[in-house]
Structure formats: structure tokens, C-alpha cells
């Protein structure tokens, strides 16, 4: 089963409605839950199966500017981890795809603009990501990262979470056009 659903709005905490939160939660997480509940009994009966979930680097490390998306993708990470350790001994394999940025309709025109520079690397083509996924599931690797910078970021976050959060705060200020003192940049 390949669970690959995701929508986003670019909203934060105070500028997103509860309806928008629910819509993203339903698509980004609950679609995975419903699909797994539909196929898992048959997989368990056969004693084998493979579940591939698409989250996002926003679900592994969080992201700027799209809080409902990041939170719902964090939940997908939790779901995939739980499924992996709960059902491994019963023949169920699980992988989690956490791409940074893939050229899909979800990115729209942003894939060619400033967002691409902020993403930390080039936008991946879908065929390139598909090959990475095939290579990873062949070896039954759980976490599939599509960009080498993502591994570096994860290592930095886990090595020193406080430093990571401080760096993310500074990046947020730059994205908002303010300096480290909170003053508008000229």
C-alpha cells in the first residue's frame, strides 16, 4: 500500500481556521489511517505486506509557514513508526518517505521561485524520487530521505534541539524580513 496524500495552505496558527485544520488532518493523516485499516487485516492473514507512507520533511523537522500541514505530517511519522514496530514480527514492513520538495502540482509556481531557494536544495523530479523509493523498499529501509541536506538537518536537530530551535527562529525572522533584534530589515 502506498499512502501518498497531502494538501497544504501556507497558514500559521492565528491565520488558519479550524475547518482548514480539520481538512488537512483528514487528508494528510486520516486517509492513511483509513487505507491501513482497509488492507492490514488481509496482510496479517497472509503474514506479509508493505506499507509505504508519504510524510514530508515538514513532518520530520517541522517547517515555516504551514502549521496544519507540518502537524498533520508529524502525525503520519508517528503512525508509520507505530505500525513498523507493532507489526514487524508479523511480516508487515513499513517505510516512510520524507521528501523535502518534489515538483508536483502541490508546489505550483513556487517550485521555480524563491521558495526553491529556501527549501535548501533543488526541487526533485518525481521520477528521481520514485527511483529512490524503489531502492529503499528493496532493502526495507524505514526512513527514506530524498535530499542529503535533510540527513544533516536531522543530525543537527537531534544533537542539540535547543540550538536547532534557535536557528529555526532566526530563519523565521529572516523569512519575515526582520533582523535578530526583531527590527525590520532595510
PLM feature segments, named:
Residues 4-9:
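Conserved NAD(P)H cofactor-binding loop of Rossmann-fold oxidoreductase domains
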Residues 11, 38-47:
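A short helix-coil junction within the Rossmann-fold of NAD(P)-dependent oxidoreductases
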Residues 12-13, 20-25:
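Substrate-binding pocket helix/loop in short-chain dehydrogenase/reductase
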Residues 14, 63-67:
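Active-site loop immediately N-terminal to the catalytic Tyr-X3-Lys motif
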Residues 36, 72:
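Active-site helix of classical SDR
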Residues 56:
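Residue(s) in the substrate-gating loop at a strand-loop-helix junction
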Residues 85-152:
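SDR active-site lid
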Amino acid at each position: 500500500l502506498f499512502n501518498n496524500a497531502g494538501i497544504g495552505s501556507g497558514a500559521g496558527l492565528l491565520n488558519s481556521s479550524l475547518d482548514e485544520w480539520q481538512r488537512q488532518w483528514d487528508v494528510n493523516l486520516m486517509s492513511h489511517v483509513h487505507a491501513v485499516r482497509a488492507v492490514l487485516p488481509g496482510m496479517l492473514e497472509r503474514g506479509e505486506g508493505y506499507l509505504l507512507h508519504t510524510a514530508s520533511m515538514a513532518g520530520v523537522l517541522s517547517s515555516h509557514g504551514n502549521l496544519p500541514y507540518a502537524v498533520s505530517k508529524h502525525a503520519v511519522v508517528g503512525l508509520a513508526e507505530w505500525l513498523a514496530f507493532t507489526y514487524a514480527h508479523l511480516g508487515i514492513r513499513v517505510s516512510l518517505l520524507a521528501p523535502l520538495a518534489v515538483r508536483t502540482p502541490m508546489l505550483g509556481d513556487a517550485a521555480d521561485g524563491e521558495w526553491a531557494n529556501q527549501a535548501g536544495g533543488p526541487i526533485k523530479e518525481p521520477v528521481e524520487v520514485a527511483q529512490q523509493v524503489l531502492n529503499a523498499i528493496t532493502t526495507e529501509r524505514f526512513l527514506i530521505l530524498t535530499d542529503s541536506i535533510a540527513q544533516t538537518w536531522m543530525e543537527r536537530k537531534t544533537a542539540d534541539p535547543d540550538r536547532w530551535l534557535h536557528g529555526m527562529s532566526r530563519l523565521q525572522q529572516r523569512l519575515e524580513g526582520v533582523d535578530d533584534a526583531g527590527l525590520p530589515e532595510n
